[in-house]
Swiss-Prot record:
The keyword Magnesium does not apply. This is tRNA-dihydrouridine synthase B. Keywords: Flavoprotein, FMN, NADP, Oxidoreductase, RNA-binding, tRNA processing, tRNA-binding. It catalyses: a 5,6-dihydrouridine in tRNA + NAD(+) = a uridine in tRNA + NADH + H(+); a 5,6-dihydrouridine in tRNA + NADP(+) = a uridine in tRNA + NADPH + H(+). Belongs to the Dus family. DusB subfamily. FMN binds at residues 16-18, 70, 139, 200-202, 224-225. The lineage of its organism: Bacteria, Pseudomonadati, Pseudomonadota, Gammaproteobacteria, Lysobacterales. InterPro entries: Aldolase_TIM, DUS-like_FMN-bd, DUS_fam, DusB, DusB-like, tRNA-dHydroUridine_Synthase_C, tRNA_hU_synthase_CS. The active site is at residue 100. Its cofactor is FMN. GO terms for molecular function: flavin adenine dinucleotide binding; FMN binding; tRNA binding; tRNA dihydrouridine synthase activity. PANTHER family: TRNA-DIHYDROURIDINE(47) SYNTHASE [NAD(P)(+)]-LIKE. Catalyzes the synthesis of 5,6-dihydrouridine (D), a modified base found in the D-loop of most tRNAs, via the reduction of the C5-C6 double bond in target uridines. Its EC number is 1.3.1.-.
């Protein structure tokens, strides 16, 4: 898949997720097979650009090309200025968020709430595309609710405004993440456009990725929640799409080493105590399908230092590898 001058391969992309797709996670997913990793949503209001959170979100030093930064907001010129600011700070792709269903975003008329105002969508897209000399992409949902499934209309507006690629989540804003994603609307959008279309929603296995590509004709798939605690899914999907072969599940030793490396990267990136706190949700995701995961989470979530968090994690997985019960009560 081509987005401007950038060839995106393999055709499996990490979705932007607030509080998840930070620099350590993006680097990990790219290393394990993602063809593109989109940053967390950054707010377009310049009053917040100097906050600790925003500075972390805007840190892309050392990331492989292309660097894709997602922006969110409601005011066309403010979004245009945010796009310029991020390009000046290293962004090579600008992604506009019109897909987030969160109430705190939609109540401010950002994210997927923008899909209710097609004229405003056109003004935002035009302003951002004209503001920067890098490709601009867009993420949307299939519509606002089941009675207003206007994704195809928004998609045509996007193409007409110069958007370089479009990602579509197969739910309406009203669904949030309930029910199941549907792909017929994505197929309809793909059939009507000349720009690349990326399918998103409920893609949680290599087989599902292949199925969605067949059903939609999309140029790539985008994976979000299924990568939480499972960043190797990108390599699994890429391998299956290339060969038709399902890779065996990763070994416990591989999971352990991947997680320990991820923890160390979080500790280094955020410092103490923030790194330990942010790592806790990732620990829960990595452990959730393993024996005594609830007990492990209860113990490791009480760790207050990087060394303690790493030691408890290493001991837990070492016990699983050895086939013995983890000594969680002793660790507590």
């Amino acid at each position: 898949m081509q987005i401007g001058p950038y060839s995106i391969a393999p055709k499996v992309i990490l979705a932007p997720m607030a509080g998840v797709t930070d620099k350590p996670f993006r680097l990990l997913c790219k290393r394990l097979g993602a063809g593109l990793a989109v940053s967390e949503m950054t707010i377009s209001d310049p009053r917040f650009w100097g906050t600790r959170k925003s500075l972390h979100r805007m840190d892309h030093a050392g990331e492989p090309d292309p660097i894709s930064v997602q922006i969110a907001g409601t005011e066309p010129q403010q979004l245009a200025e945010a796009a310029r600011y991020n390009v000046d700070h290293g962004a090579q792709l600008i992604d506009i968020n019109m897909g987030c269903p969160a109430k705190k975003v939609c109540n401010a008329w950002a994210g997927s709430a923008l899909m209710r105002d097609e004229e405003l969508v056109a003004r935002i897209l035009t302003a951002v595309v004209q503001a920067v000399n890098v490709p601009v992409t867009l993420k949307i949902r299939t519509g606002w609710d089941c009675d207003h499934r206007n994704g195809p209309t928004i998609a045509r507006i996007a193409q007409d405004c110069g958007i370089a690629a479009l990602a579509v989540h197969g739910r309406t804003r009203d669904q949030h993440y309930t029910g199941s994603a549907e792909y017929a609307t994505i197929a309809q959008i793909k059939a009507a456009l000349q720009i690349p279309v990326v399918a998103n929603g409920d893609i949680d296995s290599p087989q599902k990725a292949a199925q969605v590509l067949r059903e939609t004709g999309a140029d790539a798939v985008m994976i979000g929640r299924a990568a939480q605690g499972r960043p190797w899914i990108f390599g699994e999907v890429a391998h299956f799409l290339a060969t038709g072969e399902v890779l065996p599940p990763p070994s416990l030793a591989f999971v352990r080493d991947t997680l320990l490396g991820h923890l160390e990267a979080l500790h280094a990136f955020y410092g103490q105590p923030q790194g330990v706190r942010i790592a806790r949700k990732h620990l829960g995701w990595y452990a959730k399908d393993h024996p005594q995961s609830a007990d492990f989470r209860a113990v490791v979530n009480r760790a207050e230092t990087p060394d303690a968090q790493l030691a408890l994690t290493r001991d837990y997985f070492d016990a699983l590898i050895a086939g013995v019960p983890p000594a969680l009560s002793d660790a507590a």
